[in-house]
Regions:
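Regular secondary-structure segments
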Residues: 1, 14, 48-51, 55, ...
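Glycine- and small-hydrophobic-enriched helix-loop-helix hairpins
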Residues: 2, 118-122, 129-131
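N-terminal alpha-helical segment
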Residues: 9, 30, 46, 102-106
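Helix-termination/interfacial motifs at the ends of transmembrane alpha-helices
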Residues: 16-95
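Membrane-cytosol interface motif
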Residues: 95-115, 120
Length: 131
């Protein structure tokens, strides 16, 4: 705070919060991308498994088990996306929102102090973040 103008202080800290948020969202985007690619990789595994089944067309006894094994790759791909990757991405986004809100709360408090606002007013304004 140290004699800085409140508007300038808010501008600088808002830019810092934006950069902080963008950096944190990169990790979430990686998990989200993995959730998008995972089913595709599962389908590729299924196609490769079916190609392998085609090699055994002469033996009908092996067809059923071969097809079942081929589709396991699809189940793994869809399962990994919906049970692992996408929930991790959503959890990260929720945590990022909390961290950004904490920083915004800090900025409001610092700007209130820089403005010379009554401490009770600053406290009540910050309590609004917790409601």
């Amino acid at each position: 705070v140290d004699g800085a103008e409140p508007d300038r202080l808010r501008q600088v800290l808002d830019v810092e919060i934006g950069a902080y948020e963008a950096k944190l969202k990169l990790a979430s985007k990686i998990w989200e991308s993995a959730g998008g690619y995972s089913p595709t990789i599962g389908i590729i595994g299924a196609v490769m498994g079916l190609i392998h089944v085609m090699e055994n067309l002469a033996d009908p006894a092996k067809l059923g088990s071969g097809i079942a094994v081929a589709f396991v790759a699809t189940i793994y791909g869809v399962g990994a996306a919906n049970l692992i990757f996408l929930p991790i991405a959503k959890k990260l986004m929720a945590n990022i929102a909390i961290l950004v809100t904490q920083r915004e709360m800090l900025v409001d408090g610092l700007v209130g102090i820089a403005n010379g606002d009554n401490p009770r007013i600053v406290e009540s304004r910050l309590q609004g973040y917790l409601a």
